[in-house]
């Protein structure tokens, strides 16, 4: 969780509106994360992010990031046992640029634009191709000081609606899939114990804003199901799908609530030099 935590160089991912409140003029970060290393040794996520504050007033900033996810080498075998098969190297990447600005002393907003490229295909199949899409994030951040237990604490709130954009296709536009659009809301509190020790608590709620894929009914023919699938899922626009995602769960309102993922984070910091962090994440099975 991080939509409402204090600004840092990696805010581009969680909430780019936080860049407007960054203390430093600029920052750059590079990270490399092995993925499922106990199962495979060549799957990893690389992430590069940075920002720069514009002007002398420090009320606005630009940010950018590059994400590259390598799925390693995947062996593909033919149905014919006599054919040797081959190896593919699927990967996905996203490049985005954001602009953030303080709208008041305590409130900021940001817009991010993103290009997504996903190459999961194998070239031997001419019907399958790499997919690309464009998306945008809309983010807000509010921070202020409040008095708790006679101490000045930093209370912050954040919102980020991410990956609002076009659909992505892997077959030259014959069929297309929704991007993983998300709505993330959060709050955080920094409580100074004394001049050297600080406790931070953060909380996030995340809603997947993609419509539920219809399930074929017991008395429904395949043709009837495919017609309903096109009408209620395949042919609707991404924007309509966002609104539909709040009311289309088969289990009604209870299932809509179960779709929300919850995250809780706790951080202890000593003298702004040493930190210990822990968190808990929950989502319905």
PLM regions and their residue ranges:
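Subset of outer-membrane beta-barrel
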Residues: 1-285
């Amino acid at each position: 969780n991080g939509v409402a935590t204090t600004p840092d160089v990696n805010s581009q991912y969680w909430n780019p509106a936080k860049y407007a409140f960054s203390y430093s003029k600029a920052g750059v970060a590079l990270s490399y994360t092995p993925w499922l290393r106990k199962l495979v040794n060549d799957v990893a996520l690389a992430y590069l992010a940075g920002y720069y504050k514009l002007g002398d007033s420090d009320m606005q900033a630009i940010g950018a990031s590059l994400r590259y996810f390598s799925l390693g080498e995947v062996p593909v075998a033919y149905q014919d046992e006599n054919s040797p098969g081959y190896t593919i190297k699927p990967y996905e990447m996203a490049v985005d640029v954001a602009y953030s600005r303080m709208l008041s002393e305590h409130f900021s907003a940001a817009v991010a634009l993103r290009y997504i490229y996903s190459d999961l295909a194998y070239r031997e199949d001419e019907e399958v191709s790499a997919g690309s899409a464009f998306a945008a994030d809309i983010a807000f951040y509010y921070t202020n000081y409040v008095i708790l237990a006679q101490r000045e604490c930093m209370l912050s709130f954040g919102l980020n609606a991410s990956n609002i954009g076009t659909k992505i296709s892997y077959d030259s536009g014959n069929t297309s899939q929704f991007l993983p659009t998300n709505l993330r809301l959060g709050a955080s509190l920094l409580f100074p114990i004394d001049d050297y020790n600080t406790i931070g608590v953060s909380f996030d709620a995340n809603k997947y804003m993609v419509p539920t894929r219809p399930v074929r009914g017991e008395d429904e023919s395949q043709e009837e199901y495919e017609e309903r699938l096109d009408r209620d899922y395949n042919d609707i626009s991404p924007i309509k799908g966002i609104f539909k995602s709040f009311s289309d769960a088969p289990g009604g309102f209870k299932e809509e609530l179960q779709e929300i993922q919850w995250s809780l984070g706790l951080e202890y910091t000593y003298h702004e030099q040493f930190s210990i962090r822990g968190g808990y994440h929950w989502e319905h099975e």
